[in-house]
């Protein structure tokens, strides 16, 4: 079962809806803001079918405003996706992602859905977001990644998962970097030998295939795969960038003259 949330309130930086209000406003009773958002209840309870009816059934009274209702923000810039994350409703996140919402949107202080799920210890929601390719390197106003927020709130399982996701991303990015470097050499003055080029591209393909077939690989295994690829490509690129020692015409002539003199003396 997932954690019930941060051990402390994020009051002034994340979860407070009265952030930076003056004393007079804080003392006032909250005003009625209109009818309750019809998406809220199904989002919090995991009623995916109910949400789909609103988004996909033209006869539903809220159909035309569905996206607007979903993206309505509170005072700190959170929409209903954040509520779903806090509630640990992973299936809701997956379902709503199909409607083209931006899963990397930030609050006024730079928190993403991933930061939110990490703070609340919603491991399954973190997994869903990572599967949906959210930016795991996004920073909040404290320059914290989601992993750092999870650590701050002692969400150990979330920290471990995000470390694993980071190791996987590191390998993916290195493969992409190497592949791009091969393409760039074709445009520049220093070109790879055909054999070397094929060796590198073949190694990159092999590592991508390994990633696809080893979805549960450990952090150590991911690091090992990167090291193996690095051991293949580094000597090749080093060889390509090392200048050849070509003899100048003057040195060749001088060498030939010396050799001729030696032959004469003999």
UniProtKB/Swiss-Prot annotation:
Pfam families: Ank_2 (PF12796). Residues 1-11, 18-32 have a biased composition (Acidic residues). PROSITE patterns: ANK_REP_REGION, ANK_REPEAT. This is Ankyrin repeat domain-containing protein 45. Keywords: ANK repeat, Cytoplasm, Repeat. GO terms for cellular component: centrosome; cleavage furrow; cytoplasm; cytosol; Flemming body; midbody; plasma membrane. The keyword Cytoplasm applies. Its main location: cytoplasm. GO terms for biological process: cell population proliferation. Residues 1-43 are annotated as: Disordered. It is found in: Cytoplasm; Midbody, Midbody ring; Cleavage furrow. ANK repeats lie at residues 76-105, 109-138. InterPro entries: Ank_Repeat/CDKN_Inhibitor, Ankyrin_rpt, Ankyrin_rpt-contain_sf, HSP70_C_sf. It comes from Homo sapiens. May play a role during cell division.
């Amino acid at each position: 079962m997932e954690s019930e949330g941060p051990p402390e309130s994020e009051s002034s930086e994340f979860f407070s809806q009265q952030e930076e209000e003056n004393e007079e406003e804080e003392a006032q009773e909250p005003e009625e803001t209109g009818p309750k958002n019809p998406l809220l209840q199904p989002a919090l309870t995991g009623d995916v079918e109910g949400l789909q009816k609103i988004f996909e059934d033209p006869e539903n009274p809220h159909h035309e405003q569905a996206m607007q209702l979903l993206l309505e923000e509170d005072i700190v810039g959170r929409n209903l996706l954040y509520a779903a994350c806090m509630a640990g409703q992973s299936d809701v996140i997956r379902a709503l992602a199909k409607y083209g919402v931006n899963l990397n949107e930030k609050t006024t202080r730079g928190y993403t859905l991933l930061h939110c799920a990490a703070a609340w210890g919603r491991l399954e929601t973190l997994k869903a977001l990572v599967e949906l390719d959210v930016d795991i390197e996004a920073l909040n106003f404290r320059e914290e990644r989601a992993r750092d927020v999870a650590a701050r709130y002692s969400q150990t399982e979330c920290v471990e998962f995000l470390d694993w996701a980071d190791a996987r991303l590191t390998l993916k990015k290195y493969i992409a970097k190497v592949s791009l470097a091969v393409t760039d050499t074709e445009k520049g003055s220093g070109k790879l030998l055909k054999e070397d080029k094929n060796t590198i591209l073949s190694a990159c393909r092999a590592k991508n295939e390994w990633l696809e077939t080893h979805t549960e690989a450990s952090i150590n295994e991911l690091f090992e795969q990167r090291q193996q690829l690095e051991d293949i490509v580094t000597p090749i690129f080093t060889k390509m960038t090392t200048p050849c020692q070509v003899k100048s015409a003057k040195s060749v002539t001088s060498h030939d003259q010396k050799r001729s003199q030696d032959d004469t003396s003999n």
